């Protein structure tokens, strides 16, 4: 006569060895635990996620620059800003996990600058440079934030530092200065016209000098 399933289970628990013989186990095997990532590893993951958002933001911005339709341009710029805002969340998590991660601080400043938050951008750049004073990406990014705040003497100082240490970044700042000058010549609001003219002359002289000299160094942005 076939035993009911419940009775068979009861017997297997009551009689040693019966459970194993019948294929019924009275114990649950321990779960295998996955290794826990270190804070530094988690920071790298957040940083890479942020870079992914940043790359998309830069792509939308480039497309906007080539777009002639005003409505389409505005839409692309809004998409770019949204991606930068997403990158900020990731970079904040990265520096929370690893406050010593210089590239994350620099990229955080970049994202804040691109969304128009210059004061907070400067704080992030200052943090990066406090950790590594020769980190040229942050020097260049911070100089562009200075442009947004019309801090022209600080821009000049940053340019000279880059010119002597990282010519590639100096050239990048030169292009940013050219864009800034173009906008300010069309609308000089917030800046003394005399100072604008002096800065324009200085920038022109620096470009001529740079064209006459060979590249000294070539800085590379860190990727994690």
Predicted regions span which residues?
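Canonical tetratricopeptide repeat
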Residues: 107, 141, 175-176
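Terminal, low-structured helical/coil segments at or just beyond the last alpha-helical repeat
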Residues: 28-34, 164-224
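Structural signature of tandem alpha-helical TPR/SEL1-like repeats
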Residues: 61, 76-93, 114-127, 149-158
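Register position in tetratricopeptide repeats
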Residues: 55-56, 114, 148-149, 183
